[in-house]
Each structure stands twice: as C-alpha cells, then as structure tokens.
Amino acid sequence: MIIRQAAAQDWPQIYPIYAAIIAAGETYAFPEGQSPDEARPWWMEEPPGQTVVAESDGVIAGSAKMGPNRPGRGSHVATASFLVDPARQGQGIGRALAEYTLDWCRQAGFASIQFNAVVESNAPAVHLWQSLGFRIIGTVPESFDHPRRGLVGLHVMFRYL
C-alpha cells in the first residue's frame, strides 16, 4: 500500500467511500445525499492543506484530508479527517493514514493537531487516536445524532507534534 497526494482523477474512487460513510451516519456530520460535485469540496483540500489516498494495486482503500484547524492566529494547529473503505476497515489503513498525517503536519510546521468532533461511540477511532498520543480534552454532550444510539457526545481530541 502506498499513500500519495490525491489527484483530481482519484475523486471517482474516493466518492463512493465518502458517500457510504456519510450515509451510514455514524462518524461525520457532513450533509447526506450529496452528489459527487456537491461532496467534492467537503473532502478535497486546497493548499495549505492536502488530501491523500491509500492505494493498493491501483485501488483506493482510504483517504485523509489535513490542514490548518483555524485560519490566522489559530493556523499553527492542524486538523484532519479520515475515510477507510468499510470493506477494508480493520486492516491498518486508518493507522497508516494517521501516521502519514502526523508526519506531514510536523513537516508542514504545525505545533499540534486537534480533532474537533470524534463521535464518542466510534470506539475504534477513539482507541486509534489515543494509541497515537491523542488525549480527549473535552466532550460536547449530545451533539451528534447517531442513527441507532440517538444523541451522543463529540470528543475534542488533541496532541502536540
């Protein structure tokens, strides 16, 4: 598996992964039912950020987007989001994308990285981020409407780079 910067021609392979994860309604509060053209700006980052793909034998298995969490005086803190093909979860793709992202953020000069909205019921993600040194610094209660669990909290997770 290689991780490389995403190109425009990757979007047709990224979009079905994005659409499946958003439709499941368990991890992101992005608008549901978006067309490929509507969804593209939600995922494909422009500089100073970037979007990458995890690819194996020409097939995209996951993607990550990363960049400044806030503009101006908050731009020294990075943020990132991740997608892994539901059929390929549990194979280390998310961890590989996360490690790539942390390295990229360090090299880009960010001081730290913050995830603003990790769904507290997403135990695999919470475990992954904690194993990579992230701490839960707060939880916004009942701020995500999970399709099966109802209202659940969103963790803010942070680590220095």
Predicted regions and their residues:
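Conserved GNAT acetyl-CoA-binding A-motif
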Residues: 105-118
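Conserved acetyl-CoA-binding loop-helix of GNAT-fold acetyltransferases
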Residues: 90-105, 126-131
